């Protein structure tokens, strides 16, 4: 009797997880230099693999997105660098954005949960942020 119950519980658990749809990808918007300030708004964004983090140049820049390579371990560094589209200023660094409302999308790859800090190269002293990858 106990054996049948365990089999039933195992099958039910499998069915609940196998057919539970994954959350739909979400677009998270981050303003760069909005309202005349040199900052990212919001400064911290929580996202999952498959979500898009959309950086929007709010004031015409120049702005960019540069991840701190020393704070990100392999293989996450390489995965994140490959997820950054277009021409780059360097490793883990987007190009400069000069036009107001210019958009830069990063579709998050499957990264280990944790904090992935970034900054704007021209305004590094005050313009910092982070993507927190949720499990």
Regions found by a protein language model. Name each.
Residues 5-17:
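Bacterial N-terminal signal peptides
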């Amino acid at each position: 009797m106990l054996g049948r119950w365990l089999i039933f519980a195992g099958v039910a658990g499998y069915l609940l997880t196998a057919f539970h749809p994954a959350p739909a990808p979400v677009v998270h918007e981050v303003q760069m230099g909005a309202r005349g300030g040199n900052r990212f708004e919001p400064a911290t964004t929580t996202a999952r693999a498959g979500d898009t983090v959309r950086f929007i140049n709010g004031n015409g820049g120049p702005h960019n997105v540069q991840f701190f390579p020393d704070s990100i371990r392999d293989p996450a560094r390489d995965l994140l660098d490959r997820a950054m589209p277009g021409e780059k200023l360097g490793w883990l660094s987007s190009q400069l954005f000069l036009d107001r409302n210019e958009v830069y999308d990063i579709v998050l790859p499957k990264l280990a949960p944790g904090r992935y800090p970034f900054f704007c190269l021209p305004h590094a002293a005050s313009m910092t942020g982070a993507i927190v990858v949720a499990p």
